[in-house]
Amino acid sequence: MKTSMLAVFVALPLAFVLTAATEERAHPNELVNSLVELVKLDAERGVDKEGCKYMFGSCGKSDDCCPKLACKRTFNYCAWDGSV
């Protein structure tokens, strides 16, 4: 009984990995295109904007904060702007 359970718990993940690897080998260009699109999207959003203030960092205006953050005027700190 223990041997059969062990075989099931080893065989199922192994089958999943082999199937996923076969699918990716069948369509390698899709994976490359997806990665290229992801890098372009990050560049457009300014994810790596230099000198930006992170969450709860002090700021003078919203342009000082990193993407998806805005300067809150009450105490002049960067907080989430509500965007997705």
UniProtKB/Swiss-Prot annotation:
Expressed by the venom gland. Transmembrane segments: none annotated. GO terms for cellular component: extracellular region. The keyword Nucleotidyltransferase does not apply. Residues 1-21 form the signal peptide. Pfam families: Toxin_12. One of its GO terms (molecular function) is toxin activity. Keywords: Calcium channel impairing toxin, Disulfide bond, Ion channel impairing toxin, Knottin, Neurotoxin, Secreted, Signal, Toxin, Voltage-gated calcium channel impairing toxin. Negative results: only exhibits a weak activity on Nav1.5/SCN5A and Nav1.7/SCN9A voltage-gated sodium channel (at 3 uM, reduces by 39% and 17% the peak amplitude and slows inactivation). In addition, this toxin shows a little inhibition on Cav2.2/CACNA1B (20% at 3 uM), but does not inhibit Cav2.1/CACNA1A and Cav2.3/CACNA1E. Negative results: exists as two stable, slowly interconverting isomers. The presence of a 'disulfide through disulfide knot' structurally defines this protein as a knottin. Omega-conotoxins act at presynaptic membranes, they bind and block voltage-gated calcium channels (Cav). This toxin inhibits barium currents (IBa) mediated by L-type voltage-gated calcium channels Cav1.2/CACNA1C (IC(50)=825 nM) and Cav1.3/CACNA1C (IC(50)=2240 nM). This is Omega-theraphotoxin-Pm1a. It comes from Pelinobius muticus. The lineage of its organism: Eukaryota, Metazoa, Ecdysozoa, Arthropoda, Chelicerata.
